[in-house]
Amino acid sequence: MAGLLHLVLLSTALGGLLRPAGSVFLPRDQAHRVLQRARRANSFLEEVKQGNLERECLEEACSLEEAREVFEDAEQTDEFWSKYKDGDQCEGHPCLNQGHCKDGIGDYTCTCAEGFEGKNCEFSTREICSLDNGGCDQFCREERSEVRCSCAHGYVLGDDSKSCVSTERFPCGKFTQGRSRRWAIHTSEDALDASELEHYDPADLSPTESSLDLLGLNRTEPSAGEDGSQVVRIVGGRDCAEGECPWQALLVNEENEGFCGGTILNEFYVLTAAHCLHQAKRFTVRVGDRNTEQEEGNEMAHEVEMTVKHSRFVKETYDFDIAVLRLKTPIRFRRNVAPACLPEKDWAEATLMTQKTGIVSGFGRTHEKGRLSSTLKMLEVPYVDRSTCKLSSSFTITPNMFCAGYDTQPEDACQGDSGGPHVTRFKDTYFVTGIVSWGEGCARKGKFGVYTKVSNFLKWIDKIMKARAGAAGSRGHSEAPATWTVPPPLPL
């Protein structure tokens, strides 16, 4: 009996061990559940579990409320949600001038650095010289984060500390209208309106593609002799209208022939090229000329008291090609006779020489081998990129030179215009920026005119004009190197 009981118990135990816990195969409609991830919504105590960013919003789409559960901070939630909802609006760095971008839903917000405002921090709230010249009529400089305006000789700052008001009847850098015009302190009555000029459209010019061959001496032909036969002249352009080129001076030799140009700086001083002083032993300076074959009553010839040539002038390279003439008698400013303004160095280089164009004038030849022009001509020429200028030239372009002109249009300075003015207009006032120096031919394709860069010599010019003409002690001055020469008297 006992043996039978043990047998029954053993069979029962073995049967329980050998019976499977469940079916090995599941029905088709239940098989997909084996690898299915359990959702939080279906998990135990869902609402009391701490939020998880990956589980809530990356593994599946989440709501703003679910994102808020993750961060438990309104600012962090908003920052995440703005990117999560529609992408990062700050990805393109829309905020300018070091502004900080904050992403939003379908938008962004810029926090601007000090001194800037606007949707993209694009507007400056402070005046700077690089933005509209700081609002200044003429010279602009920045001191202690503030703009300081100043004016050329013959002007004073207006009550607004921005405008420049003339204190002279014929202020520098202004076109003259003649005797009938009224004189007043306001500069608008002292000059022709610029809209009356027939300028080329600067928008059609490319400083690096349109180049002009403004030349002094033709470097590929024999150098100029005593008669000045190889000096530079204007090709193309147009006649200077009444009062348009009042700062033009003409150097005239003993044969009463013009051989070089010059720029009137004030009643006693005229700026020209150093190489012009090698073209004639004796010469006078004529001002007021618009037609050398007609007398209009404004012409006047002045004898030269002293010539001041830069002592570092190099005849072979035309480096330091600059000279100043002091006249024996003062120039009387009148119709067609007025000075051009001298700029400040930094302002000239940052503002004037970054303009699109300048103006050159003279009585030069009308083409490379043509006759001299009897009428004063002017030509608007674009500034040329320095690297383009250097690549186009067969000769060295030194730091004391710059290029201007066209490479395709048949317009240029040519033989006879050497030493003449290159001026740049800024707000209807004209400032001296260059001296016609040299070039390769006249209006040759792909060649540029080369000018003396006046901004490099402004201190030198200033010291020359402040010195007494007969001051022997000024000769060889270290700060104003120059060769002082008193020309022989002209024959009666």
Swiss-Prot record:
UniProt-listed Enzyme Commission number(s): 3.4.21.6
Residues listed as glycosylation sites in the UniProt record: 208, 218, 485
Catalytic activity: Selective cleavage of Arg-|-Thr and then Arg-|-Ile bonds in prothrombin to form thrombin
Keyword set includes Repeat: yes
Signal peptide annotation: 1-23
Record domain Peptidase S1: where: 234-466
PROSITE patterns on file: ASX_HYDROXYL, EGF_1, EGF_2, EGF_3, EGF_CA, GLA_1, GLA_2, TRYPSIN_DOM
GO annotation, biological process: blood coagulation; proteolysis
Similarity section: Belongs to the peptidase S1 family.
Assembly behavior: The two chains are formed from a single-chain precursor by the excision of two Arg residues and are held together by 1 or more disulfide bonds. Forms a heterodimer with SERPINA5. Interacts (activated) with guianensin, an anticoagulant protein from Simulium guianense saliva. Interacts (activated) with simukunin, an anticoagulant protein from Simulium vittatum saliva.
Name recorded for this polypeptide: Coagulation factor X
Protein's organism: Bos taurus (Bovine)
Gene that this polypeptide is encoded by: F10
